[in-house]
Structures are given as structure tokens and as C-alpha cells.
Amino acid sequence: MSRTTVALFFGGQSAEHEISIISAQSIAAHLDTERFTLLPIYITHSGEWLCDGFARTLLTTNLASKLRGSSREETAAALQQMVRNAAQAPCNRNLAALGVDVAFLALHGSFGEDGRMQGFLETCGIPYTGCGVLASALTMDKALTKLCVADAGIAVAQGTNILSADYLANPNAVEASVEAQVSYPLFVKPASLGSSIGISKVHNREELHPALQAACALDWKVVVESTVKGREIEVAVLGNADPIASVCGEIEPGKEFYDFQDKYMGNSAKLFIPARIPESLQEEVRRSALTAYRALGCSGMARVDFFVDESTNSVVLNEVNTIPGFTDISMYPQMMEASGISYRNLITRLLELALEPLRR
């Protein structure tokens, strides 16, 4: 039986470039090579595609240790120097000519998780893992995600949305408007970034100004939300027409919230699988995850994140990630492992879901 050629896309033009590489390294290491042939395609910071040679080398680079010892900016600069040193010509973007049967997307954030890459692959006639164009674009926007899931009956945190252009034009007025609508402590989030990049927890006006400045520099729209005091619970969802929800996972941040360092460097957060909540509450969270998944039109996979309010036990949606982290310490593969699906089988199942006739 001939093997299926899988184009593994990673890197990309988002702020999550380096994490995408680490996710791709784990995916490549767990790919069933008896069924699949790997064609790694690395997308540089500037958007060039580098196939096979340098891309394959990059999959064996110990990037996680580099991130631990330096800033993201320093790591990005080092990667760009590696690309220049490789002096490899960009590859052909005709995926059919490259013999690609299916694409595995390990591209986090903008230009990979937001529907643009999905749309490109649709026009090429190449099936791909994860959600389709609409769900990818919709869930990338935290503000629109909240509107959709609230309409489906799922609770969301109180908040407001800010256009960066409005803030830059009149910061004092926008800050006053925020304070009139949302109580401290609050969170300031770029609407369309993941991995906690650009997120700040704010306790007063003095902290609000730099938080909004930082978020507005990263995105054209910013979400401001009230803090939900309670447990952070996550669920991995897998499937197309008949999705399944994993056991719940729980995050106990080592800091005020689960930031970039804790997500990918494993510094201080504690992870609990299953979550330390009653089984009845776990069932409610899983049902809510499936409701959100369907309401948003998701397919393939998504990680659905919630808060459980400590005073009321109400389940409040935090966000939905359609290409969740796939590093060795990422919650999605760990929750699936705890639900009886090994990392290797998870990769295979995602490729099978991508190739289902209804997805094509």
C-alpha cells in the first residue's frame, strides 16, 4: 500500500512562529511513518516557503532550550540568521506538483490559524487538518467568538471591545470608557493573538495605559474582560460530524495568569488531568465544549478553554483554539492521552478526519 504524503506546515508570519516549530517537531516525531510520508514545509517570518532540506533540519533543532535561555526576539533573530545561512531557494507552492495528499497545519496565530491558509488550501484542492475557513476565521477573533457562544447559551465574561485606532486617537477617553464598563481587576487581550501573547492583567488605571498600548500595538482590535475568579479548565475536542470531548484538564498558574512562559517553557504552572472538580461539573464543562464547538462550526479539532467561577460554579467560556499547541507539554495532546488516544494515534486520527469525504 502506498503511503500518504503529508505536508507539515510550520513557522509562519505570526508572533507564535517559534512555538509552531516546537509543535511541528513533536508532530513529526509521532507521525506513523508506515502510513505517511513527511514533507516538512517551513514558512519563514517573511512568508517564504522552504521545503524539505532546511525544514527537515529545523525539525531536529532544540528550539525549546533556546527559548528558555533567551527572549522570543533573540530566538527569532537567530532563526532568521539560520535561514540566511542555509541559502536555500524558496520551494514551489504548487502542492500537487510536490505530490502532497494532505496538509497538517501546525501554524499558530495569524496567517495560519485564522482562515487564510485554510482558504489557500481549499483553492488548491488539498485537504487539511483542523477547522475549515469560516470556523478558523471566527474563532481567531475573541470578540466574535464570545458573541457566537453566548447566542448558544454559554456564559462569557463581562467586557468590551476597543479598536486600536480609536485608542491611539484618544487614549484618555477610551480608558475612561473601559473603567465605566469593566471593573478591576481586568484582562486586556489582543483580539486575534494566541499563546497569551500581549495579554495583561490590570489592577488600576496606572496599569491600564501600558496594557492597552501593548495590546493595540499587536492587533487592530482589543478585548477587555472582567476577571473570573476560579479554576481554569480546558477540554480537547476531536471530530467532524460527531465530535468527542476529552477528560477535563486544569491549569493552576504559577503567576496571576497562564502566560507564554508557563504554556511553553513549563516554568511554574501546575497541570492537573483530570481536573480537580466534581464529575458532574466535568460533564457540564464537556457538554459546553461540544456546544461551543458545534456553534462555531468547528471540525477536526479545537481546545476549548473555560473558567469555573469559584463562588457560583458557573462555567464561563474563555477562548477556543483551533490549532492548539502540540508541544510535549501542551494540554491538547495530554488530555487526549488521558482519554485513551495516544499522541501517535491522535496525529493519525486528525489526518483521517481531514481526508473524510464530507470535509472535502
From Swiss-Prot:
InterPro entries: ATP-grasp, ATP_grasp_subdomain_1, D-Ala_lig_Van_CS, D_ala_D_ala, Dala_Dala_lig_C, Dala_Dala_lig_N, PreATP-grasp_dom_sf. Transmembrane segments: none annotated. PROSITE patterns: ATP_GRASP, DALA_DALA_LIGASE_1, DALA_DALA_LIGASE_2. It is found in: Cytoplasm. GO terms for biological process: cell wall organization; peptidoglycan biosynthetic process; regulation of cell shape. One of its GO terms (molecular function) is ATP binding. The keyword Cell wall biogenesis/degradation applies. Residues 146-352 form the ATP-grasp domain. The keyword Cytoplasm applies. ATP binds at residues 179-234. Belongs to the D-alanine--D-alanine ligase family. This is D-alanine--D-alanine ligase. It comes from Chlorobium chlorochromatii (strain CaD3). The lineage of its organism: Bacteria, Pseudomonadati, Chlorobiota, Chlorobiia, Chlorobiales. The gene is ddl.
